């Protein structure tokens, strides 16, 4: 764990009790688990995501999540990336094809501890765990989207 990630989460101002409590959980986990950026930590790990607004800010980009069978904002595993904003932008590009993205805020937009049920992925069982999710607010300068089937 880098000091930068810890400080970014520590300086985040929660907007509600859920974010306040999730922030405390994340800070404690980061302090106790140096491998928090890696999905190899099977109890919990950091993920990065983004709410993405259209160029005119009248629409939001959502993706269909096959595991949960529901719509969600774009995001995924940090996979060791210490810059969570960069990880979120990478995930948005991978999932939507949008490349021209820019942050609309000076830091984290929201925090969430998300429970993940055990499931099969690419023929391998993934045990139940928690995603310590950091969300950013982005605007896309692109109009076209592409589908990522998985």
Task: Provide a role label for each language-model segment.
Residues 33, 42, 67-69, 74, ...:
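Glycine-rich, flexible loop/turn motifs
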Residues 1-17, 21:
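N-terminal domain-onset segments
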Residues 37-73:
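N-terminal strand-loop-strand
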Residues 79-150:
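Unchanged
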Residues 1-3, 35-45, 86, 122-132:
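Short charge-dense sequence patches
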Residues 14-49:
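Acidic, metal-coordinating catalytic segment for phosphate/diphosphate chemistry
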Residues 10-13, 47-58, 132-144:
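Phosphate-binding glycine-rich loops and adjacent basic patches that engage nucleotide phosphates
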